[in-house]
């Protein structure tokens, strides 16, 4: 298990993981889009009750008390253990628990996939894409059925960026590779639950190894 340092040192005013952002984007979708999201096994996103992010002191405590090897969360004296695994994630969030491996985030925050995505979405190569940019774009795309595929791709980007595998920055970066050839209906066959566990393990390792927030 990790050595616990001073949690008060570990604050960050920016939320990388945000269910609120995801539910806001789900709310922008028209019913025709939501039907496909439901068919993909993600329709319950609109029913999430969480509208704010976790208390940052609590988040820091939890990240220090997860063993990245076993992915056990020790909440006390060694007897209050929660095992974080794909089954637990499925029960908590009801994410697709399919047999196929989902695409993974890129190792680089600046790669060709990101450049192609920026071009497809109409952004300059030097533009840093934030979730607020995606919300504005999505609000316009959903108005025209001809843009439905791109609208769902933008929603998938927010799904990965703000929920499934939030990375080291708030801007879109590593997730660009995950939405190439994006098909919303393929999500139901992916094991997104294991992806959440794997990405959380990486986050825990980075958190515990760093003296400042990543």
Language model: regions and residue ranges:
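Long, internal protein-protein interaction and assembly surfaces
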Residues: 34, 49, 87, 98-99, ...
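N-terminal leader regions that mediate targeting or early regulatory function
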Residues: 1-149
